[in-house]
């Protein structure tokens, strides 16, 4: 598990970087989280766990509790469309979206260590890190 000291250190580093590198919050947070993951070890006895969460301004940052199978790094901004009902979409549009999802799935970074995935979030820009343990 991520210790309280490690959590505070990552939190402090994030706040420092947020102050001086405004446009790179998510990038730096991802780097530090991956670095933190490498240090941690995965407990085989663990079936499920919750990661410590920090709410930092308009971002919700979830830090992994152990070496993840992959990190789902989801980032959405105003460039993404608001969610629509499936019934309203045309067949061509659905096919195009499915193709985009497939491309995203194939673009795995560091052999499935970090996966960039788009989400529809029309309220605000959010940066979320989710971890899954490899058993």
Swiss-Prot record:
The listed locations are: Mitochondrion membrane
| Keyword annotations of the record | Meiosis, Membrane, Mitochondrion, Transmembrane, Transmembrane helix
Any one GO BP annotation for this protein: meiotic cell cycle
Query: One cellular component GO annotation, for this chain's record?
Result: mitochondrion
Membrane topology category:
Single-pass membrane protein
* Transmembrane regions: 20-39
Amino acid composition bias (Basic residues), ranges on this chain:
86-98
Where do the record's region annotations for Disordered lie? 81-101
Where is this chain primarily localised? mitochondrion
Entry function: Has a role in meiosis.
Supply the name of the protein: Meiotically up-regulated gene 116 protein
Gene from which the chain derives: mug116
């Amino acid at each position: 598990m991520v210790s309280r000291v490690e959590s505070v250190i990552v939190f402090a580093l994030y706040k420092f970087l947020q102050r001086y590198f405004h446009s790179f919050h998510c990038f730096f947070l991802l780097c530090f989280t991956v670095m933190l993951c490498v240090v941690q070890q995965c407990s085989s006895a663990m079936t499920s766990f919750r990661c410590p969460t920090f709410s930092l301004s308009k971002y919700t940052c979830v830090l992994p509790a152990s070496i993840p199978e992959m990190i789902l790094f989801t980032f959405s901004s105003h460039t993404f469309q608001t969610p629509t009902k499936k019934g309203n979409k045309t067949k061509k549009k659905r096919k195009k979206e499915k193709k985009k999802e497939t491309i995203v799935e194939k673009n795995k970074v560091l052999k499935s260590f970090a996966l960039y995935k788009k989400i529809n979030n029309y309220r605000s820009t959010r940066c979320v890190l989710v971890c899954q343990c490899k058993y």
